[in-house]
Amino acid sequence: MNSFSAERAVSPLDGSELWVVLDPELVPHREASDFLRALHGASRSPHTIRAYAGRVASFLGWCASQGVEWSSVSLASLARFKHFVEATPGRDGRLRSGATVNATLTAVCEFLRFCARTGVIEQAVAGQLSEPRWLRFTPPGFDAGESGQFRRMRARLLKARAETAFPEAFTPDQAGQIMACCQRPRERFMVTLLHDGGLRIGEALGLRRSDLHLLPDSRCVGCTVLGAHVHVRHRANPNGALAKSPFPRTVPASDAVLFSYADYQHERAEILGEDGCDMVFVNLYHEPLGAPMTYRAAKRLFERLARECGFPVRPHMFRHTAATGWVRAGTDLDVVQALLGHVSLASTTVYLHARDADKRRAVEAVAAGRRYR
């Protein structure tokens, strides 16, 4: 296959991370790179942009290897590309899941639609990616409009079969085991913050000290939010961490978060003294000391916890655990939505799934009251 590649670049203006797609001659592919810059300008997550860069590069490479002109690609050719993605093993040697195939096609479709909007390709190329479809049944939280006009959606023709995966959450015993494996105060604070607050790892790594309002009353610093809380804000950070949602939110801080943060602050002061870094999470155990903690460092932490605990430990599982706990405690879905920072309530309803134990109790409760002859 003619190799197109996704490469990381650094903006000479503000030092922010950018992604470009290079052709086999190592020349930036103009349309693909413009698309990625547009995603950056729209404040899309760095992880999303990086993933889209690789998927668009794969599509362009496939087109070049098959003699297909990407700018006038047909629906039949896109179906062939879909089959190629399905049949080609990933880096781990396994075939890609339906969800991964769909994610690849989503990136390609967004790229083609962007090119159509900017006049690079014909509108007909983007128009073939979907078809009119009337939604008879709508998901929870979906606004169909006053006259039902939003029920008429456009369904992608290129879609792989994907199984619905329920969010992975820790049991109370597993959460306790993870905490017991945390060796240092900074580790305990991070795990507690993710577990109790439901923050994404990018949101946690992007926190500034000024975002933590841990007094019962923060009006002295101009904040009217009651009680101890954490502000989650979307902005550029020196460690590349970024909150996914562009909308700011506040998350109440539990007593466990307060106590673990105090322990972490003592540890930080003992190691660094009076450091001037405003980032909450900084390097304490390796050089450069005092520098903002990176995604790579956080990844090493959770990989170590997984090895010691004997089960998968990923940062996002703490978010799933927090959300599942709130829902099962009877918290209204709109409150859970606000805590998680979901734009759509439909994203929150995934936590309404029934456990096997719940289903068994329901069946046995009804069956116990019946009399069979």
What are these regions (language model features)?
Residues 109, 188-202, 210, 324-325, ...:
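Short pre-functional
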Residues 202, 206-259, 276:
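Conserved tyrosine-mediated DNA breakage-rejoining catalytic core shared by Y-recombinases
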Residues 163-164, 168-201, 205, 275:
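Basic, Lys/Arg- and aromatic-enriched nucleic-acid-binding interface segment
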